[in-house]
Amino acid sequence: MSIQNPYCLPICMLIAMLSAGPLCLSGQNLDNLGSSLRSEGLNITGNINLSNQTYWASGIAPRRDGMMTMVRAGLNFRFLGFSAPFSMVFSDQNANFNLPSYTFLGISPRYKWATLHAGDRNMNFSKYTMSGISFRGAGLELNPGKLQAAFFYGRLNRALANDLSAAGNLNDFYQRRGMGARIGYGDQNSAYYLNFFSARDRSDVFPDTELGERLRPTENMVLSVQARQRIGKRLSLHGELAHSVYNQDQNAQPVADEDINFINRMLGLFRPNQSLISGQAYNIGLQYNLGQTGLQGSYERIDRGYRTLGALFFNNDTENITAGINRTFFKNTLQVFVNGGLERVNLDDSEREATDRVIASVNLSYRPNDRWFLSGMYGNFRNDTKLRVRTDFTVPVDSIFLAQVNQSANITALRQLGTTERPASLQFLLNHQRAGNVVNDSVVNSAQSRFTTASLSFTAGSPTTGLQWNTGLTLNFIELGAIRSRSFAPIVGINKSLLNNALTLNFNSGLSFFRQSGTEDNKVFNLHLGGNYQLRNSHRLGLSAMHIRRFGSPDALRNFHEWYGQLNYGYNFGGKIGGGSSNNQN
């Protein structure tokens, strides 16, 4: 990390944690502490779930291991207002298919407005800084009223193996350490936040990969400002502005301070080198409500050089403009939403391809009464790409205009039938997608595709007898260039509850017929049987089996059988230790 003292933030976090303790205790009425200890006691709740899956195949090579085990557990302690949830997930190694074993352990004790995270946890700051990733370390969240603060420090997820065919923990070859902070003030009408994120790879352990390229240790730092403001009763605004600096190689030659502006040095916290790339990201949006009508609009721009290691995936070099309107009619029984937008990439004109995307959609939903529901959607997605050939910059640019047009539409109709004692329903679904390429205003016939799916299902049952059954039919039509394919599949299912709903049995089966280019190809039959049994009040036992058979193909090598099995066991427990009364459960 380019912070002068990498332990600065963890030390500050520790001080904050120690400071929070006396503040929390001071909120207690010390005169009544003894009586609270005697009356409340220690409450413990938790659960454990065990799962074992089996697999066997005939006629084809196995597509997964024959045996796999998973354990999930949770435990929560409550004492004098403190709450400490603990979670654990374990899976054994899938050796034949190179899937690693893994174990996740974490605990997040909470007291009033303070939460401490330890172990494998995740915290979200903002889209541009840290979102959607987990860490192994420590974190702290403080929410005393309108003030909000969050801190974390730990090892971030990294998935790289020197031998890509090896199974095991893929994080062992090198580590990425990260830290971050989020401080803000807000309520329902307005909020303002300052976000900080920093990450650095260990440079002492960094192996070559099979690809033959030495991956370089990187480092990254991001600062962002977020705001949300409500203006009057109808208008609200929100936005975020972020700046990122990213050294692609920690070992690159340093640069003089006078060659780097103050912003790229991140107020002196970051030390750029010759591999530096930097950029900005910002967005602004508004919402305006006019009774039954609502208006929305947003603008977002992310530079090519913007990077954050606090997200699993981040799309840069893009600009988005979107607008939408929604309206209700006929006493809120009809809802209409229209949305459209434009996306542009290659903002700095540094690539040979310039792409523009146009998106428009219309959504309708209509519920005239309790028995009918209708909905529909139409979307148009257009992707325009200009391919340019720059062989001689002294002559005009040669170019080819390529457009991809994708259209989709779906319709849903639901009709409630029967009575309260014997409910039933009929549902119809239709989905159609069409795509095609246009090159210099000419349609490419070989690149056109159409996908259509239609399904009709009927469900009925009797709550008093615990019986429910369903049947249906699904049709699929596919046109992909010169390939024509269609299939239809009737299905049936039955669920039955017994022994005062303690035992639930289910049966599902279907037969699919496939035909391609006018010739019958094959059929697929599937059968699923399962059951769940509630043992006493806290134990659950589940067993299921599924068989898949593909047959009817002239090529015998394409016919096969597969069997899947799964055994589940679950246990919930809870009770009180001490206190005025005991309420233990087994």
Write out the residue ranges for each language-model feature:
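Cleavable N-terminal export/targeting peptides
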Residues: M1-L37, G570-N586
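Long, low-hydrophobicity, solvent-exposed regions enriched in small/turn-prone and acidic residues
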Residues: L33-N96, Q229-R230, R367, L417-T419, ...
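Transmembrane beta-strand segments of Gram-negative outer membrane beta-barrel proteins
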Residues: L30-G59, F77-F86, P109-A118, L147-A149, ...
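Outer-membrane beta-barrel translocator/receptor signature
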Residues: D65-V71, F79-A84, N98-T103, K112-W113, ...
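Hydrophobic, small-residue-rich alpha-helical packing segments that form membrane-like cores
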Residues: Y153, R158, N162-E219, I231
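The substrate-binding groove and active-site-proximal loops of carbohydrate-active enzymes
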Residues: N122-S126, R214, R271
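Exposed, low-structure sequence patches enriched in small/polar residues
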Residues: R64-R72, P100, A181-I183, Y192, ...
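Outer membrane beta-barrel
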Residues: V89-L156, Y288, G294-L295, R301-G305
